[in-house]
């Protein structure tokens, strides 16, 4: 997702209630079909046609083929409202966010999804080093295993945000981001329909029905697609064919979704057998507050945080479930109002794997929710290292086997936070 996180910064994320995975392909979502006023639609069409001409020229795709896929494209007024930033009186609420995603219905669906895909999850875990609980947690938080994948046509979403983003301070930058995503969508759908890139000015071999179906598939109001909610650029860069049928289908194929999430996390630096985050010690809260700057960058060593009383010595010891004292970390601040409306903050120390989750969705709330969802499913948030690095004769497991993430036999399912 080329940093899918950045593309979804404007949206906390889609999610809703949970459902059993067996229902994921049966749930039909009504596609929103709106249109703007005539003047706005005219400007929209002019800008869209210019982009199509640009793609046609740069990729040598017949312009008529592109235009036929966008003849009914619309600017959707409600999308512009959905991406507006919250009002000035809005207060971030970690506890409310957590309650929304780490709840019994979603967890039950997660366990069912795990059971239905246990063998493949185990396979992906071995290949990528990403625990099954983490993968199940991400898909559960994103779409409840396919139940909530959005109800807008993706071409309408990306076209709307590319050419009529709301008047915000970052309007120009956001429009450029979505123009890029719209181009990525076109190229994704062209190749999915059998086309070559560059196309050499021919549509030979292209299934026009599949091209249109790809452009018209449902998405979130930010243009994210399928069970794992990948942006088009992320699909092209990180999605993989998990079920081996020769195509990538993140909406209908759980295996494609599972393998793609594992691949994304691996490429973005997931460290197998390492924890995600540590809670800040009560005596270190004041020090953590001073270091919290909202920037997801590994900047302090674990030893520095131990010296400040933010972490314990055990958290800097691999043999005790911690990490190397030279490992880098950063402070995660999760604000919430208490029952009296007074601002409070819960602090964690984010490690490398926390940062990897942030690459998936640039939100501390999201990343900590994934971690806690996974824990609720049985994930152990501690390092997994050999008990005795020097002893080989007394232990039946090899060092290479031990270096692998824990298997699902010791897990109960991904946890929701």
Regions from the PLM with identified roles:
Residues 2-11:
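Sec-dependent signal peptide recognition
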Residues 38, 45-50, 54-75, 81, ...:
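A contiguous strand-loop segment
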Residues 94-260:
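Acidic/His-rich structured neighborhood in mature extracellular/periplasmic domains
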